[in-house]
Structure formats: C-alpha cells, structure tokens
C-alpha cells in the first residue's frame, strides 16, 4: 500500500504551499497593469473659477496731489466719482498756450467747496439724471498762478487773471471751480464760447444783448442759466466775466478765514 506522509513531511509541504502562495500574490500585485488616463480626457481644476484676477494698482498720485492731501484738501474724483474731470491746464490748448500743470493731474477743492459741489451735482441730476458736471479747473497753487500772470501781464488779458502778488484769486484757496455740463451722451452742452474764452461773449451780464446780436443762441443762454441755477442753489457765486467760473466765498472772506495754497 502507498506510504502515508509523516507528520514532518506534511508540515514541510504546508510551509512550501504558504511560501508559494505569498510569492504568487506579490508578483500579481507588482505585475498588475498600472491604470493610466489619457491626458486628453483628464479632468482639470478650474483655476479661473477659484483664483481672482489680479487687481491693477491705482495710478500713483502726483507730488502736488500728495501735498494737497496733507493740507486737508479734497480730491474731487474720490469724493464724487460721478463728476467728470478734465483739467484744461494739463494741456497747452488753453488761453496761455502753455502747459501750466506740469505735475498736478488731479482736481482738488477745499472741503467747504467740495460739499457744495456735490450738492450741485445732485441738484443737476434731479432735473436731468443723465447729465453731469465737468470740472476744468479747481484748486490752483499760487506758483501756477504766477506762471499764468507772467503770460498775461502787459496785455489786455491781464484783467482776467488775479495778480499773485496781491494774494491771488479764489482758485488759490481751493474755493473756486471752472465748470460746465455734460449731456447724457457725455458731450459738453453748448455754452456759446469754449471754457477759457477771454472776451465779451463769455460775460454773463450781456447774454440778452448777445442773443439779440446773434452771438449767442437762446439754447446756449438756457444752458448757462441751468449751470448757474444748480451752482447758485448749492452755494456758489458766478463770476460776471466768465460763465464757467464760480466762487464759494468772497475774496475778503477767503483771506480772513482760509489759507492760500503756496
């Protein structure tokens, strides 16, 4: 009869079976094909939805603007961004024919004048929601006033410019503004003359005569009246010789209560 394996032999075969089984399992794991994914079908993380686009830095303020900030004057664009700004003395196409603001690119006012200007803008928009005030000049350093005076002294235009040696004008206190109105398309309302026109046609005291003479249309006169209405109601006073110029206080009051900008 066949010989039955002894106890030791059975134990040996049992260990051999275990070793072979473990070896086969290990090989199976090592040789298992690696799962790969076609790069064309890989899912990508939508970075654009999770990472905000970088915000461009705000333009650096000019040296003069920082100085006006330190004196407590108010940047018009920061106080009311709905008011348009186009400083005419940052270009040479003004009555002097020269660039007067080499550094200043921002429009500033004294806080008292800024408060009234914001009210004027609000009054205008209550009547014409699509309209806006546009500022052509505001606070003006006395050093710039001197440049302007040097251009006109000895000419017939000197009567339109305040002499800096006598304290300058209300612009030099941040208490005057040169201003007009934009329509709902962003275009300036016709006023009969450009801003900064030094001549009789810009005088507000002769508008009826100018209309009668055909030098000013009735619509242009009405546009001027609208500008004066909102500015006066807000606390400004018009300058008789310039339809665009408005003062917040008198020159005497400015000298007594306010500080001139050097």
Where are these regions (language model features)?
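Conserved metal-phosphate-binding beta-hairpin within the catalytic cores
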Residues: 246
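Short, well-ordered surface patches within globular domains
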Residues: 144
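Segments that shape or occlude catalytic/ligand-binding pockets
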Residues: 141
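Sec-dependent N-terminal signal peptides
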Residues: 14-21
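Extracytoplasmic cell-surface/polysaccharide-interacting catalytic and binding patches
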Residues: 28-138, 148-151, 155-241, 250-262
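Positively charged n-region of N-terminal signal peptides that target proteins for export
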Residues: 5-13
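C-terminal motif of bacterial Sec signal peptides marking the signal peptidase cleavage site
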Residues: 23-26
């Amino acid at each position: 009869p066949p010989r039955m394996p002894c106890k030791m032999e059975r134990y040996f075969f049992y260990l051999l079976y275990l070793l072979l089984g473990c070896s086969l399992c290990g090989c199976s794991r090592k040789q298992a094909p690696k799962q790969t994914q076609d790069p064309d079908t890989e899912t990508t993380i939508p970075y654009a939805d999770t990472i905000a686009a970088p915000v461009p830095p705000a333009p650096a303020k000019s040296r003069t603007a920082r100085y006006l900030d330190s004196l407590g004057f108010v940047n018009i664009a920061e106080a009311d961004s709905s008011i348009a700004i186009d400083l005419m003395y940052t270009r040479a196409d003004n009555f002097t024919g020269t660039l007067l603001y080499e550094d200043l690119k921002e429009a500033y006012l004294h806080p008292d004048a800024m408060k009234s200007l914001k009210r004027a803008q609000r009054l205008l928009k209550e009547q014409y929601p699509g309209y806006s005030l546009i500022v052509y000049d505001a606070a003006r350093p006395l050093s710039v006033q001197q440049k302007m005076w040097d251009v006109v002294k000895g000419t017939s235009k000197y009567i339109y410019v305040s002499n800096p040696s006598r304290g300058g004008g209300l612009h030099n206190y941040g208490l005057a503004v040169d201003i007009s109105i934009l329509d709902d398309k962003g275009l300036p309302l016709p006023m009969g003359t450009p801003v900064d026109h030094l001549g009789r046609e810009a005088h507000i005291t002769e508008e009826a005569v100018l209309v009668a003479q055909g030098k000013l249309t009735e619509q242009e006169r009405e546009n001027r009246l609208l500008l004066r209405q909102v500015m006066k109601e807000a606390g400004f006073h018009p300058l008789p010789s310039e339809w665009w110029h408005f003062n917040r206080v008198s020159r005497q009051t400015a000298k007594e209560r306010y500080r001139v900008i050097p």
